[in-house]
From Swiss-Prot:
InterPro entries: GHMP_kinase_C_dom (IPR013750), GHMP_kinase_C_sf (IPR036554), GHMP_kinase_N_dom (IPR006204), GHMP_knse_ATP-bd_CS (IPR006203), Homoserine_kinase (IPR000870), Ribosomal_Su5_D2-typ_SF (IPR020568), Ribsml_uS5_D2-typ_fold_subgr (IPR014721). One of its GO terms (molecular function) is homoserine kinase activity. Signal peptide: none annotated. It catalyses: L-homoserine + ATP = O-phospho-L-homoserine + ADP + H(+). This is Homoserine kinase. NCBIfam families: thrB. SUPFAM superfamilies: GHMP Kinase, C-terminal domain, Ribosomal protein S5 domain 2-like.
Amino acid sequence: MTQTLPVGLSATSVVAASSANLGPGFDSLGIALSLYDEIVVETVESGLTVHVEGEGAGQVPLDQTHLVVRAINKGLQAAGFSAPGLVVRCRNDIPHSRGLGSSAAAVVGGLAAVNGLVTQAGSEPMDDARLIQLSSEFEGHPDNAAAAVLGGAVVSWTEQAGAFGGEPRYSAVPVRLHPDIRLFPAVPQQRSSTAETRVLLPEQVSHVDARFNLSRAALLVVALSERPDLLMAATEDVLHQPQRAAAMPASAEYLAILRRCGIAAVLSGAGPSVLGLSAQSGLPAEALEYGTAHGFTVTEMSVGAGVRWTAGAVVRN
């Protein structure tokens, strides 16, 4: 039986950006970045009000189709609750449609905020495994969602639904990140969507290409955790980055320049952002100057934390 939450409850969640694939780990590897969105949810007598500040303001819908609202409704349903009405406030720092996991952050943040609401009604919160499952059902793959839930670097996988149907099972485990590794996201003004770039990928790949990526993905786990000196070889990919290059030539060119400068650069998710991984303390001047001159915002970030939620409206400064 569904319970109705009382009026006057509030909850806050803070959720990180993420970069998926990391080169060879297509739909499997991901890492959280220290760039965060904040969601504050309140239960009210009736209706729905959505406020958006920062990224996406004036561009995203402010009704039931808003991704955060959809995630909240899914989380409430999974927990056996409904809300009489909601006020949802989103403070967004994660760029949209840039390959930095903004949609995964919206979903994970919405689900986590539900934890803050239902615990005030005497219910147990959803654990990380449940958050990964529900958020990945939105995404269709768990790499960004798992990184947003767990923080740090993750390896995720999908077990297909059985003969009787149902959702696939999504899971993830954390990867210990070597302390010397630095993250350098480069974000262009250009936008892109995962759906648009996935159609560029072939339905089938050769055994040679599959073997190449399998070896690099396995090596990348070692490079991330123990051997940063192997990052250049470990981030090579033949399954998706070359195929997407024509749709984002500026990103492909900057990726190549970073790699020529010794930075293990990859497309961030489906692009168009580029992520550099390095044990160096900064980017070479040539790489930084090229990025700035060609419209990329290049920064150094630390690894992001896992999603945090609390009962009550706790707004960050």
